[in-house]
Amino acid sequence: MFYLKKYQKISMKILMSKNYFQVIRAGINTTFQDEGRKNLYHVGIPFSGAMDKRNYFLSNKLVGNKINSPALEFAYQGPLLKYFGNKINIAITGDVNFRIKKKDITIDGNCYQSLNLEDGDEVDILSTNKSVYGYLAIGGQIDLKYQWSSCSTNTKAIIGANDGKKLENKQVINISKLNNQSVERKLNYINTKIENIRIIKGTNFDYFSDKGKKIFLEKEFIVSKLTDRMGMRLEGPKIENIIDTNIKSEGLIKGVIQVPADGNPIVMLSDHGTIGGYPKIGVVISADYDKLVQLPPGYKIKFKQVDLSSAENLFKLYDLETQNLISQIE
């Protein structure tokens, strides 16, 4: 009996000292993401990972994590989380409206800086501002399940952290290890939007008529409401195909633009399938992908063609800019 009581006391002590977040409101589409699953296309496993890699990396750096640590990605409206435990730091990146609710005061939050939470504090992510995705990094190690060396959640394939599901109300996010909370980090950064999305020719570019190519490269398209982590549907003038709208299925990559029978292009995003049978007219260059995924429904875009060498150089420049931003965070 003595040992049972002693065990119960120890168990309660462990429970009370545990650091965790209680999910009060899960948000519209909140998932755990990291860099994604590399080198698995050949076995039918999508890449997944954070949609906007730059903002994801910055969120982790601001809380002192390795930049490829798991973080929460949310779309439009984020979660309302209540924290229990020792002091912890968080950071939110993107163009996001949020509040920190403490015992006696509610504070409007600022993105791109580390923020301390204490026992009983709440973080309420209200909305993204004329954009889609935001990131919440937690300073420490989140208890998560990994599959194929990644915790990235793909809800269509039902793989990754949280049993492949979106965050749900009332669930708990356990933190097994905390970072040093005394270091304050901040970055002066403003997200910008682009209207011209640069692309290279797709492997089936010549399957389209001259008129279809002209429409693709000169006309405006509107981001559809039928857009998710798997693909971005675009609405606008129909792109004419001169061979066949259904071809032998081929491998897909992130950013490739397929054109189905209705003539409306679809950009493959991070959770896309690994093969597809629609002609591929173009591929969004890697340097523009982060900004593309942040464009909300109703936003107008145009495509601009560049050659492969330019696409490679533009990505090197974008990657260098990202690394410079990371290095500015002490």
Residue locations for each model-derived region?
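Conserved "landmark" site that anchors the functional core of diverse proteins
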Residues: 2-330
